[in-house]
Amino acid sequence: LGTYANTMVLSPVRMIQLTVAGMIARTWGRVIMVGAAAVTEPAPNNVLSNMYRAGLAHYCKTLAGEVIRDGVTVNVVSPTAVLTERTRGTAAVRGARKGLTAEEELARREQASLAGRFGAPEDFGALVAFLAGGNAGYMTGANWRVDGGSAGGLG
């Protein structure tokens, strides 16, 4: 429990606290945290991840209101089903539980998605690059989903 809390919440919060003062002093900065779909839609049987990810997102939302007048924005970008090495690793574990190979589990998940494909790291990176730039100075306190339309609602 303690290690998980440290990894998911306390370490990111400490990093933000160490860097945001410099951003405020420069009257410009961007804090962009990586979230997950669980921020808005808890995943079954994943209580700790759901709780900690939502907690970090709410911390970011609160901080956003405190630092926006100093030229600092704070956002969370939450990917779902982006094809990475981690996605491949979890497919191997989940597939094995179902008697499937990693490739079969990946294909099953891909076909089940609304987009009919996994997101690419570039899909995620494009949003992060925009939020980090000068044209996103009024965009703060949000949880941005990169999910191929998989969200059950508008949030």
Task: Map each language-model feature to its residues.
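Catalytic Tyr-X3-Lys loop
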Residues: 1-14, 32, 49, 56
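Conserved catalytic-site loops of classical short-chain dehydrogenases/reductases
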Residues: 2, 29-34, 72-75
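A short, exposed helix-loop element centered on a Lys and neighboring polar residues
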Residues: 16-17, 61
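Short, flexible catalytic-loop segment of classical short-chain dehydrogenase/reductase
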Residues: 40, 74, 79-89, 93-95
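Short C-terminal tail/terminal secondary-structure segment
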Residues: 41, 129, 140-155
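Short, small/polar-rich loop/turn modules that mediate ligand/substrate recognition or access, typified
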Residues: 68, 73, 139-141
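A conserved structural motif in NAD(P)-dependent oxidoreductases
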Residues: 101, 113-124
